[in-house]
Design a protein with these regions (language model features):
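A short helix->loop->beta-strand "cap" motif at the edges of active sites that frequently abuts
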Residues: 100-104, 203, 269
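C-terminal amphipathic helix plus adjacent low-complexity
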Residues: 296-362
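Conserved phosphoryl-transfer catalytic core
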Residues: 287-299
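A nucleotide-sugar donor-handling region in carbohydrate enzymes
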Residues: 109-192
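Active-site and donor-binding regions of nucleotide-sugar-utilizing enzymes
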Residues: 6-31, 35-131, 212
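A donor-sugar binding/catalytic signature common to diverse glycosyltransferases
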Residues: 13, 20-24, 237-286
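Donor-nucleotide binding loops and adjacent catalytic segments primarily
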Residues: 167, 174-244
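Extreme N-terminal starter segment of soluble prokaryotic enzymes
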Residues: 1-4
């Protein structure tokens, strides 16, 4: 089976990260020839080892990476996956419609836990002017969706990393014995309030951070208001394959976007989701919908989880108080996060579920 994946990079690294992870799974785990068409190879190169964005097309880890424009003169593969509703080149769409047999055309959508997703998952959508269907495929956290991307060796790698955790944190001059929080959020997050909460609590803590605007804000706050109880460990940007180690090394996570949101859930660690802000507070509705899904798994600690997440994204509650409760109930949330991960694993990997769906349409 041959596969084309189209990636229109719009927001930071999230779009590229999701597409690269899917392409890698299809290539490395299933052995399928995969072409990834992308409009911003420069962004992809920052999270993909061995990719020179100036030398396209190229083969990286078994995946053929092409400039988006290459599709205009290419023939479709047996499966064509457009991600997040990106519009394919018109000439390529015509080739899909004319091919015999027609390729299976998939629109891989954004992850959402909202109720309506279950009713739209796997539905066909006729092209407005061509005689061809494409199918909506939704990642999700219920049995009636496509699940999440889970590599076959993910948990083996996490288990192996446990013995290297201390050395990993020490490489950032952090004390492995201290409570460690990984912070990967948008610059608009309530970082001043968070820093204030850490100072007021007074207990020693490690902050593990990737380089970026949010890290610069926290560093400036530290310069203005030094605090002996807060230790910083700042990392340069790393390949996607190394990102999980930062989650595994931490006790609690603050993450953003979609790909890191999924990886946080699969790490089995309590997390705060800095969801991408949208107009009319649409993002808050998405956050609350996700909260309803995990509520049965978090039980007694759920109110603490949702209050902290709403505080982070809406600034409608006292963050200092929420953080104190978060730290107090961390043991309960750790157990809940692992139960939630077990549930996600039971849904199967998105890549496997997508392949099963494709085979049912051939």
């Amino acid at each position: 089976m041959t596969i084309d994946i189209f990636c229109d990079v719009i927001d930071n690294f999230g779009d590229a990260g999701v597409c690269w992870r899917l392409a890698s799974i299809f290539s490395c785990e299933h052995g399928f020839p995969v072409k990834l068409y992308i409009n911003d190879a420069e962004t992809l190169s920052k999270i993909t080892a061995g990719l020179d964005p100036k030398k396209l097309p190229c083969l990286v880890q078994g995946v053929e990476i092409h400039d988006w424009k290459d599709a205009e003169t290419s023939e479709p593969s047996q499966v064509v996956i457009e991600t997040f509703g990106c519009r394919l080149p018109i000439a390529f769409e015509h080739k899909i419609a004319a091919a015999r047999p027609q390729p299976i055309w998939i629109n891989l959508e954004y992850l959402s836990a909202e109720d309506w997703v279950e009713g739209c998952h796997s539905l066909p959508s006729p092209h407005p002017s061509l005689n061809v269907n494409k199918y909506y495929f939704f990642p999700g956290v219920t049995k009636k969706t496509g699940g999440l991307m889970i590599e076959k060796d993910l948990f083996i790698r996490q288990e192996r990393f446990a013995k290297d955790r201390n050395k990993f944190l020490e490489s950032f001059n952090l004390d492995p014995a201290l409570f460690t929080v990984f912070v990967f959020c948008y610059p608009g997050a309530p970082l001043a309030e968070f820093y204030k909460a850490l100072r007021q609590r007074g207990k020693e803590i490690n902050l593990l951070l990737p380089k970026g605007a949010a890290t610069d804000i926290l560093s400036k706050l530290y310069e203005e208001h030094p605090s002996r109880n807060i230790q910083f460990g700042v990392s340069k940007m790393v390949p996607q394959s190394e990102f999980d180690k930062f989650l595994w090394a931490s006790d609690s996570l603050i993450i953003r976007g979609e790909d890191s949101f999924v990886r946080a859930q699969l790490s089995g660690k309590p997390f705060i989701w800095n969801i991408y802000p949208q107009t009319e507070e649409t993002h808050i509705k998405k956050l609350e919908a996700f909260g309803e899904r995990i509520c049965p798994y978090y039980g007694e600690s759920y109110q603490t989880w949702i209050d902290m997440n709403l505080s982070w994204n809406k600034s409608s509650r006292d963050l200092t108080c929420c953080w104190e409760r978060w730290c107090h109930e961390l043991p309960l949330m750790k157990e809940a996060a692992q139960h939630w991960r077990d549930h996600l694993v039971s849904l199967g990997s998105l890549a496997d579920n997508l392949l099963s769906f494709v085979k049912s349409k051939i």
